[in-house]
Each structure stands twice: as C-alpha cells, then as structure tokens.
From Swiss-Prot:
It holds the Pfam family SSB. Plays an important role in DNA replication, recombination and repair. Binds to ssDNA and to an array of partner proteins to recruit them to their sites of action during DNA metabolism. One of its GO terms (biological process) is DNA replication. The gene is ssb1. This is Single-stranded DNA-binding protein 1. Homotetramer. One of its GO terms (cellular component) is nucleoid.
Length: 163
C-alpha cells in the first residue's frame, strides 16, 4: 500500500505549536493549495488542507514559516475520529507532514528583492571581490542571494546551439 502526499501551498495562518504531556512538539497548520483548473468565472480556486507535523520539524516550522509563506511538504494522509461534547462522532482527515521546505527566500517573503546582494547576511560588511588561486576562498553566497542576479543576457546565435 502507498500513502504518500506532496503539497506545495501557502500557509493560511501561523502554525500552532503545542506540546504533548510526554513533551513531544506538535504543530497544526493549514495550506492553501491552488487547483490546476479555473472555475466557470475564470478564477483559480484553492483547497485548504489541514496538516500536522511532529517533533523538531514542528518547532522549526513554527519558528520559520509564518502566514503566507510558500511551503512544500511531504507526508501521508491520516484519518481519525473522536466524540465531541455533544456526544457525536467527528471524523477528521489531515496530512501528517514528515518534512517541510520553505520555497522562497526571506527577502521575497518580506517584500525585498530576491536578487539583492546582502554580503552573506552581514550588513555593512566589507566585501573582498578579489580571488586568487592561493587564497583558497570560495564565494560566500547566502541563502537569499542569487549568484546570477547581476549577470547580463548572453548573445548566442542559433548556429552556436547544438540542437
């Protein structure tokens, strides 16, 4: 049997982080996932999918992913049921996320330019743009920085392409 879920969507609210009596971290959140088609009025609808994540991943999600963040998750579908205060049986279907990944940079989420150079996360740090073979330095690209952000378009003729 296979029970595997992969979702990419935006968080509809900040994750709610709680701890079980045995001190296990658990976070609940929901993702708005766009459908692949448009409705009759030409608008793209979204599904709002309830998710839960456990342990260290729950703490990381609660600390780093906020409402509106574009998140990718992998996990599985789980159904459970309980009896509510009115004595009725309630069935819940949710995705148990086993891992997550933030899919956009912090600068993009906070309204900045994703291609802006930020000196590897150190503001106002002097930059050393000279590289010598003996220095053994590698460029320090931060997570938010594109190494090709300041490049110019290449001038290639069709004759130079191998296909």
């Amino acid at each position: 049997m296979i029970n595997n879920v992969v979702l990419v969507g935006r968080m509809t609210r900040d994750a709610e982080l709680r701890y079980t009596p045995s001190n296990q971290a658990v976070a609940t959140f929901s993702l708005a996932v766009n459908r692949n088609f448009k409705n009759q009025s030409g608008e793209r609808e979204a599904d709002f999918i309830n998710c839960v994540i456990w342990r260290q991943q729950a703490e990381n999600l609660a600390n780093w992913a906020k409402k509106g963040a574009l998140v990718g998750i992998t996990g599985r579908i789980q159904t459970r049921n309980y009896e509510n205060q009115q004595g009725q049986r309630v069935y819940v279907t949710e995705v148990v996320a086993e891992s997550f990944q933030l899919l956009e940079s912090r600068a993009t989420r906070e309204g900045g330019s994703p291609n802006s150079y930020n000196n590897g996360g150190y503001n106002n740090a002097p930059s050393n743009n000279s590289y010598s073979a003996s220095s053994q330095q590698t460029p320090n690209f931060s997570r938010d920085e594109s190494p090709f952000g300041n490049s110019n378009p290449m001038d290639i003729s069709d004759d130079d392409l191998p296909f």
